[in-house]
């Protein structure tokens, strides 16, 4: 899984039928402090995340291992909303 920050939403009025009803969010990989570091990825949202939240997302076949995405054509899925990141005994990120 990868730490990421939700930076936007994606709306598609016409979709492949198997992804109908999925919430799609734009996520950028981030460092343990929550600062975005990478390019944006469109993720299916399995947990109800929102813009500005730090999340864990998985890609590839792991992205299709949730109840929401099972057997659906998705390549990245938000699996968790992060509350706290601790590294070496130091809190690097804490959700407000």
From Swiss-Prot:
The keyword Acetylation does not apply. Residues 1-83 form the BMV domain. Coiled coil: none annotated. Disruption phenotype: Not essential for BMC formation; when an artificial operon without BMC-P proteins (Hoch_5815, Hoch_5812, Hoch_3341, Hoch_5816) is expressed in E.coli BMC shells are made. The keyword tRNA processing does not apply. Gene3D superfamilies: EutN/Ccml. GO terms for cellular component: bacterial microcompartment. Its main location: other. It is found in: Bacterial microcompartment. Disulfide bonds: none annotated. Pfam families: EutN_CcmL. Keywords: Bacterial microcompartment. Artificial BMCs can be made in E.coli by expressing (Hoch_5815, Hoch_5812, Hoch_3341, Hoch_5816, Hoch_4425, Hoch_4426, Hoch_5814) or (BMC-H (Hoch_5815), BMC-P (Hoch_5814), and 3 BMC-T (Hoch_5812, Hoch_5816, Hoch_3341)). Cargo proteins can be targeted to this BMC. BMC-H can be modified to place its N- and C-terminii in the interior of the shell (called CPH). Fusing proteins to the C-terminus of CPH allows targeting of cargo proteins to the lumen of the organelle composed of CPH, BMC-P and BMC-T1. Forms vertices in bacterial microcompartment (BMC) shells. Expression of 5 proteins in E.coli (BMC-H (Hoch_5815), BMC-P (Hoch_5814), and 3 BMC-T (Hoch_5812, Hoch_5816, Hoch_3341)) forms 40 nm artificial BMC with a molecular mass of 6.5 MDa. There are 12 BMC-P pentamers per BMC. The shell facets are 20-30 Angstroms thick, with 1 of BMC-T trimers protruding to the exterior. Homopentamer. The base of the pyramid faces outward. This is Bacterial microcompartment shell vertex protein. It comes from Haliangium ochraceum (strain DSM 14365 / JCM 11303 / SMP-2). The lineage of its organism: Bacteria, Pseudomonadati, Myxococcota, Polyangia, Haliangiales.
């Amino acid at each position: 899984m990868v730490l990421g920050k939700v930076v936007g939403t994606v709306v598609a009025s016409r979709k492949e039928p198997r992804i109908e009803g999925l919430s799609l969010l734009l996520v950028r990989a981030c460092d343990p402090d929550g600062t975005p570091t990478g390019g944006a990825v469109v993720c299916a949202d399995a947990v109800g995340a929102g813009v500005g939240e730090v999340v864990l997302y998985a890609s590839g076949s792991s992205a299709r291992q949730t109840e929401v995405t099972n057997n659906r054509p998705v390549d990245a899925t938000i699996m968790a909303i992060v509350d706290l990141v601790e590294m070496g005994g130091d809190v690097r990120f804490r959700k407000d």
